[in-house]
């Protein structure tokens, strides 16, 4: 099992200082929340689970097979692109029926009022994401927006670490043990989809500087001050492996993830986070 990148071993539940005190300039011993990263389908908009069955039907794969992994495993670039376009077509049709999650605009207005950065990390392609932001959140800035074109996708933590690094949130790699933890998370030397990318692109996608000539990283994206909000196990696992706190937006389909070891907090509506963050984020105790 890959470990997550963290600045120190965690003890007890994840906590962040109350935002109402941070904004008021009050000193607090708890860490300050640095930003929030959101998934899209099932998180910013209501779930469109019908898409996944349609995608698997058109690809001819069972539910047990990951859709993107299947496409990336196809033998030729032409086959990969044809398969990718077949699922894009399904998403284009479905995006016209997007419905905003309850509490969406209230939460975003609150985060904007508190000056918090917002990013997106999704397995969707860019068109449905742009459609949602234009339709429901035209006055709210999300940057960066990490979509399907970024590889490797969730549950790999690379997208979250890239966002952290783009926000200037980095840490130095301390020693050989820490270096091994970094390698375990970002998969250096283990192959994978990003291994064939040019070095510059690979470093950017890993959210890391390095490796140098000796295979060591100088610094990595530090997501320990971030929250990942999502509705799937991929979201919770990517957040946990990146070192971020995780929030599950629960529904009838994913309720079993409420007790998952990668889930720090569970909410029924997005605007529940307003009070949680204002009073101070406290995750659940995980044994």
Describe these PLM feature segments.
Residues 44, 118-121, 228, 266:
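Conserved SAM-binding loop
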Residues 52-56, 88-91, 129-132:
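Hydrophobic alpha-helical core bundles mediating ligand binding, dimerization, or RNAP-core interactions
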Residues 4, 10-70, 76-79:
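Active-site neighborhood of HAD-like aspartate-dependent phosphohydrolases
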Residues 80-91, 140-144:
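Short, basic/glycine-rich phosphate-binding loops at helix/coil junctions
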Residues 93-120, 126-130, 157:
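Short, acidic loop-to-helix structural element flanking the phosphoryl-transfer center
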Residues 49-52, 101, 125-127, 233, ...:
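Alpha-helix N-cap/helix-start and coil->helix boundary motif
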Residues 1-34, 109, 131-287:
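Asp-based, Mg2+/Mn2+-dependent phosphohydrolase catalytic module
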């Amino acid at each position: 099992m890959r470990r997550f990148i963290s600045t120190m071993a965690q003890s007890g539940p994840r906590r962040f200082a109350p935002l109402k005190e941070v904004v008021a300039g009050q000193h607090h011993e708890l860490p300050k929340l640095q930003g929030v990263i959101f998934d899209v389908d099932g998180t910013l908009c209501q779930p469109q689970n019908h898409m996944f069955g349609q995608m698997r039907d058109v690809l001819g794969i069972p539910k047990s097979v990951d859709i993107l992994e299947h496409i990336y495993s196809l033998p030729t670039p032409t086959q990969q692109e044809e398969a990718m376009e077949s699922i894009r077509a399904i998403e284009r049709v479905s995006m016209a029926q997007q419905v905003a999650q309850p509490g969406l605009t209230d939460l975003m207005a609150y985060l904007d009022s508190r000056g918090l950065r917002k990013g997106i990390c999704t397995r969707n392609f860019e068109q449905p994401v742009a459609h949602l932001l234009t339709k429901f959140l035209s006055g709210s800035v999300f940057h960066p927006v990490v979509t399907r074109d970024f590889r490797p996708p969730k549950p790999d933590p690379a997208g979250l670490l890239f966002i952290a690094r783009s926000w200037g949130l980095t840490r130095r790699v301390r020693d050989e043990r820490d270096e091994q933890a970094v390698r375990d998370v970002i998969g250096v030397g283990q192959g994978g989809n990003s291994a064939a990318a040019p070095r510059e692109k690979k470093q950017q996608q890993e959210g890391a500087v390095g490796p140098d000539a000796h295979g060591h990283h100088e610094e990595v994206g530090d997501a320990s001050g971030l929250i990942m909000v999502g509705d799937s196990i991929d979201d919770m696992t990517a957040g946990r492996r990146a070192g971020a706190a995780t929030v599950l937006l629960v529904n009838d389909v994913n309720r079993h993830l409420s007790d998952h070891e990668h889930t720090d907090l569970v909410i029924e509506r997005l605007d529940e986070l307003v009070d949680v963050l204002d009073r101070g984020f406290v995750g659940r105790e995980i044994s």
